[in-house]
């Protein structure tokens, strides 16, 4: 049924010569174009072109020399009524769509990144060469720390406080050997997390105490 209606909707009359651009005169006058005949359901739907009106334009536009020849034609100012639709030049600006907004976001992000990089470069160049950032403190491992705390204030060296374990090991070593060689002194310092000077001073003080005690005992014996 649909194919029958589609085939019978428009039926063109027998072959009509094609539209010839060379026989149209000045830009294709309507009078020189052959009329087409169409029929549908027994009705004649032929198209006829009215004869052209005399004109003084080269392009076939009807423009009378006297503007009073068409009194019914409204003026241009009257045509532009308050409720008229805007023309092509007066068309409202188009609202940017979703895709244009998405395309504008990367551009804004790139501008923000570039401005941030410029600010960082200015901040780096603004610092003088002498005022550089302080170096990070060196990492201290447990084996590098010492058990004693020695603080130097007012140019005077404070007394070294030995731990109980250090004192016990030094007393054992003094009991077997009251005078240490440099090699043995370095070995004990490494084992007790002390330096060679501290070991040397401790043995000096311990020998003085030992001599003092021995003198006291000799006097009491007399």
From Swiss-Prot:
Q: What GO terms fall under cellular component here?
A: cell junction; chromatin; nucleoplasm; nucleus
InterPro entries registered for this protein in UniProt: Antp_homeobox_Deformed_sf (IPR050609), HD (IPR001356), HD_metazoa (IPR020479), Homeobox_antennapedia (IPR017995), Homeobox_Antennapedia_CS (IPR001827), Homeobox_CS (IPR017970), Homeodomain-like_sf (IPR009057)
According to its UniProt entry, this protein's organism is Homo sapiens (Human)
Principal location listed in the UniProt entry:
nucleus
Give GO MF terms, alphabetically.
Answer: DNA-binding transcription factor activity; DNA-binding transcription factor activity, RNA polymerase II-specific; RNA polymerase II cis-regulatory region sequence-specific DNA binding
Q: Does the keyword Transcription apply?
A: yes
Q: What is this protein called?
A: Homeobox protein Hox-C5
Pfam families from the UniProt entry:
Homeodomain
Signal peptide positions on this chain:
none
> Which Gene3D superfamilies has this protein been placed in?
Homeodomain-like (1.10.10.60)
Q: Where is this region: Disordered?
A: 68-141
Q: Provide one Gene Ontology biological process annotation.
A: regulation of transcription by RNA polymerase II
- The residue ranges marked as DNA-binding region are 155-214
What does the protein in this record do?
Sequence-specific transcription factor which is part of a developmental regulatory system that provides cells with specific positional identities on the anterior-posterior axis.
Motif Antp-type hexapeptide: where in chain: 140-145
Which residue windows does the record flag with biased composition (Basic and acidic residues)?
107-122
Q: Where is this protein localized, as stated in its record? A: Nucleus
């Amino acid at each position: 049924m649909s194919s029958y209606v589609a085939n019978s909707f428009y039926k063109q009359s027998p072959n009509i010569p094609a539209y010839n651009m060379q026989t149209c005169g000045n830009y294709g006058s309507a009078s020189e174009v052959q009329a087409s005949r169409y029929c549908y359901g027994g009705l004649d739907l032929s198209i006829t072109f009215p004869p052209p009106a005399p004109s003084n334009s080269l392009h076939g536009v009807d423009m009378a020399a006297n503007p009073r020849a068409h009194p019914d034609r409204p003026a241009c100012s009257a045509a532009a009524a308050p409720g008229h639709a805007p023309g092509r030049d007066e068309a409202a600006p188009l609202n940017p769509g979703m895709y244009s907004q998405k395309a504008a976001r990367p551009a804004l992000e790139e501008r923000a990144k570039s401005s941030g990089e410029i600010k960082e470069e200015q901040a780096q160049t603004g610092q003088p060469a002498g005022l550089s950032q302080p170096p990070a403190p060196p990492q201290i491992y447990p084996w590098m720390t010492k058990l004693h705390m020695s603080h130097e204030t007012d140019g005077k060296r404070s007394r070294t406080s030995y731990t109980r374990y250090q004192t016990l090991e030094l007393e054992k070593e003094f009991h077997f050997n009251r005078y240490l060689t440099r090699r043995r002194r370095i070995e004990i310092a490494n084992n007790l997390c002390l330096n060679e000077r501290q070991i040397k001073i401790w043995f000096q003080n311990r020998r003085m105490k030992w001599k003092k005690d021995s003198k006291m005992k000799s006097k009491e014996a007399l």
